[in-house]
């Protein structure tokens, strides 16, 4: 899935730039793909049991791993050329927190920067896989309006059989 779904979508987004933020890297599978394509990568993971081993594994590389809440990261405004999130939006405990995340993405993106993501659709088999886990699906039908409310626009959306992919941009001016 990473090489057939995620990587082509990231490459279709174009140049991610020199300073990229990955939100919710988990064990770092997508981090490994991204770090080979960008100069500098900051990965923000809220779960210490995932952030700590990822930080240790990637020590001395072009990746900085932070254990933090991505909805209030404390990172510099207008810093990142791109922000990514892969299969993590549905793990946010509420739609309100998803919207806070979108606002934080807007805050930390440079003008003209891109927000690239993939997430699961609301399907029975995906819900069954989250029985003991958070599953607050994002409706791709209203994603554009939610991103626009956060200040992001120029949405490109691709809805597949079990997931959707998106690219949005922070306006240049």
Where are these regions (language model features)?
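Short amphipathic alpha-helix with an adjacent loop that forms part of the alpha/beta core around
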Residues: 73-78
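A short glycine-rich, Lys/Arg-flanked "PGG" loop and its adjoining helix->strand segment in the class I
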Residues: 99-111
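Residue-level recognition of oxygen-bearing side chains
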Residues: 80, 97
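Class I (Rossmann-like) S-adenosyl-L-methionine-dependent methyltransferase catalytic domain
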Residues: 1-62, 67-72, 95-96, 116-173
């Amino acid at each position: 899935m990473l090489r057939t779904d995620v990587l082509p979508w990231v490459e279709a987004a174009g140049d991610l730039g020199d300073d990229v933020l990955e939100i919710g890297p988990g064990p770092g599978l997508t981090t490994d793909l991204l770090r080979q394509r960008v100069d500098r990568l900051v990965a923000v993971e809220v779960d210490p049991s995932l952030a700590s081993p990822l930080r240790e594994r990637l020590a001395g590389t072009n990746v900085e791993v932070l254990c933090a809440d991505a909805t209030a990261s404390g990172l510099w405004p207008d810093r990142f050329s791109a922000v990514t999130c892969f299969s993590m939006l549905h793990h946010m405990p509420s739609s309100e927190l998803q919207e806070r995340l979108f606002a934080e993405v807007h805050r930390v993106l440079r003008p003209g920067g891109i927000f690239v993501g993939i997430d699961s659709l609301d399907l029975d088999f995906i819900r069954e896989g989250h029985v003991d886990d958070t599953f607050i699906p994002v409706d791709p039908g209203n994603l554009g309006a939610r991103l626009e409310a956060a200040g992001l626009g120029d949405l490109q959306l691709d809805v597949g059989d079990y997931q959707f992919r998106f690219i949005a941009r922070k306006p240049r001016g």
